[in-house]
Amino acid sequence: MHYTTLGHSGIKISRLCLGGMSFGEASPGFHQWTIGPRETRAVIERALEHGINFIDTANSYSFGTSEEYIGDALRSLSVAREDVVLASKVHFNEGGLSAAAIKREIEGTLKRLGTDYLDLYIIHRFDYDTPMEETVKALDDLVRAGKVRALGASAMYAYQLHNLQDIARENGWTEFTSMQCHYNLLYREDEREMIPVCRQFDMAITPYSPLASGHLCRPTWESASTRGTTDKTMVNKYDRDRTIDMPIVERVAKVAEEHGVPMSQVALAWHWARGIEAPIVGCSKPERVDDAVAALDLELSDAEIDFLEELYQPHALVGPKGRPGEKELAGTTNVKLTR
């Protein structure tokens, strides 16, 4: 396993993060494709065997049962607390990112994970209903209380992250050290502003959906899997751009064939070639962990990276929330992204 540092926090993380959205109690109308406690334990055990020490989840994943399954698995495997970097998120709950909600939700998360502190606490989205100062101060209080080691953010506009960092700096509060953004070969909009802002603040990039919800894992668009047929969020995120994205999928398949590896390994290797610290991979089987880890040994040439990126076209923004009552910001019309 290869390791790096979580931004300016000094926390050592594996170059792969195990995502917890695949874990938890399946529920109709939400995540019907998640796996149970026994399967969760098997996936986590395999990840740990490979040296993956970074696990991400959220209070909203499967209504908290993702956190429960992860906590149960780590206890049953007798994993020392200092050997894992646990991250969870807050926002999709009553009260959003208000001080009261943050204070309440961290206690629930810690209880479900079976720990007395989090290594990384991430705000899942930007909260328009709560003053930024209130949110940042509440998060800083958790750090000072020893309940959280570092802070992260996810899926927002770059100007919002910049404002949050400015508030933290001006008040001497804890700054954010990581950004969990939507980033893959089919969606590269954050190269325009978010990623440069993160580099300015010495933040780690830990993208979600590095495999575009499976679209970068197979040469065809459709999937007969439970997730492929029930996940409306995935459909809304990618299907509207199928026409412009499918040629990129075909190029991933071509590069994978030339290397004799699964397409997923090419898609992941591209992230590291781009300087990304730790893409988050969701795995429903131990073998999927094996495939992801093998991608660390795949090196793409500059010519291959250019080949994979050449056909990218601008996309509507996916992830950040627009201000309530206002039309969401559109994507850019600048076609060419350069390395």
Question: How should these model regions be labeled?
Answer:
Residues 6, 18, 40, 55, ...:
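Conserved, mostly hydrophobic/aromatic
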Residues 22, 59-61, 90-94, 124-127, ...:
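Active-site-proximal loop/turn and secondary-structure-junction residues that shape catalytic pockets
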Residues 27, 93-193, 200, 204:
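Glycine/proline-rich, positively charged
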Residues 44, 67, 71-74, 106-110, ...:
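Generic structural signal for well-ordered alpha-helices
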